[in-house]
């Protein structure tokens, strides 16, 4: 079996990636989230596949087909809630994974980092088109508001929006194509994950100390497979608690009402994991400026490898940048809170301050603290 594992053309790839992979001996639990994201992706694809067997992407029947899944399909309610709450677990793991990358300086592996940003954007696109499918009030108005932002693009904006809609408003054509996108994008994400792993295994994994770990590596199996298994069990337990006891806690009550183009909800907002970007979008009074800020709020992650001037790898021995990092995390939580609040004083002001702070921390404060800490080392 051992000879087959090491010599068989297909098993050899699996062996080099998950069994005999040389892994730093000191990586902590923060490194578990990569494997947890893989599990989340598998759960989403499997539950999504079963939901797609019963869902109809037609404006007249989409809402009732989701109700039919919950009421008439065997364990349909469970599959639906695992899928909906699985998306939330996916984004929790994703945010922690990116946060760990920033904290421990994983962005120096620029190819892996940049593929990760593309993965993040693709996952956000998948979640957005998926949120439209139940065809509730918030699904419809969320799709209308977010796609309408593209009309801010000079010259081609209006044409582009109507092209995406497949008409002059969000309607049957929009729902059908969004279902097609939602079905195909997870498989594109899977392909990108393989590219992400390919680049990661070219350089080897980063580790908490930030030092070269080539002299101290252990095989991935059994050490980290068992460690990851614990994380997977905890993730599944959290997901089951969420899906069985609090299935609708992260959803929007407006989505229990079928989509009505003649009745606008009092407060249109996306799912909780987009609220930070939505708050940044709303904090700028100009439409085009808001759209640019929204895009930059994610693409700014690509600036980390370029703005990094530190002589040390990661933040483990850098107290000034550590403080700035945790301020950044707190600021993100404030933005998430503001994104879910109505557009009125004092929320608009807090949102504007938090949005300015978001970009200031990444572009100005972190590079400044790098320089200060480099000078402290010289003393």
Curated annotation (Swiss-Prot):
GO cellular component: mitochondrial inner membrane; respiratory chain complex III
One BP term from GO: mitochondrial electron transport, ubiquinol to cytochrome c
Protein origin, superkingdom: Eukaryota
Residue ranges of the TM segments: 33-53, 77-98, 113-133, 178-198, 226-246, 288-308, 320-340, 347-367
Single GO MF descriptor: ubiquinol-cytochrome-c reductase activity
InterPro entries the UniProt entry points to: Cyt_b/b6_C, Cyt_b/b6_C_sf, Cyt_b/b6_N, Cytb/b6-like_sf, Cytochrome_b, Cytochrome_b_C_euk/bac, Cytochrome_b_N_euk/bac, Di-haem_cyt_TM
Compartment(s) of residence: Mitochondrion inner membrane
Membrane topology: Multi-pass membrane protein
Cofactor: how and how many bound: Binds 2 heme b groups non-covalently.
Family matches, as CDD domains: cytochrome_b_C (cd00290), Cytochrome_b_N (cd00284)
Residues that coordinate or bind a ubiquinone: 201
Family annotation (Pfam families): Cytochrom_B_C (PF00032), Cytochrome_B (PF00033)
Tagged with keyword Transmembrane helix: yes
Role, per record: Component of the ubiquinol-cytochrome c reductase complex (complex III or cytochrome b-c1 complex) that is part of the mitochondrial respiratory chain. The b-c1 complex mediates electron transfer from ubiquinol to cytochrome c. Contributes to the generation of a proton gradient across the mitochondrial membrane that is then used for ATP synthesis.
Other information: Heme 1 (or BL or b562) is low-potential and absorbs at about 562 nm, and heme 2 (or BH or b566) is high-potential and absorbs at about 566 nm.
Family, per entry: Belongs to the cytochrome b family.
Subunit structure: The cytochrome bc1 complex contains 11 subunits: 3 respiratory subunits (MT-CYB, CYC1 and UQCRFS1), 2 core proteins (UQCRC1 and UQCRC2) and 6 low-molecular weight proteins (UQCRH/QCR6, UQCRB/QCR7, UQCRQ/QCR8, UQCR10/QCR9, UQCR11/QCR10 and a cleavage product of UQCRFS1). This cytochrome bc1 complex then forms a dimer.
Protein's name according to its UniProt entry: Cytochrome b
Organism for this UniProt entry: Necromys urichi
Gene this protein is translated from: MT-CYB
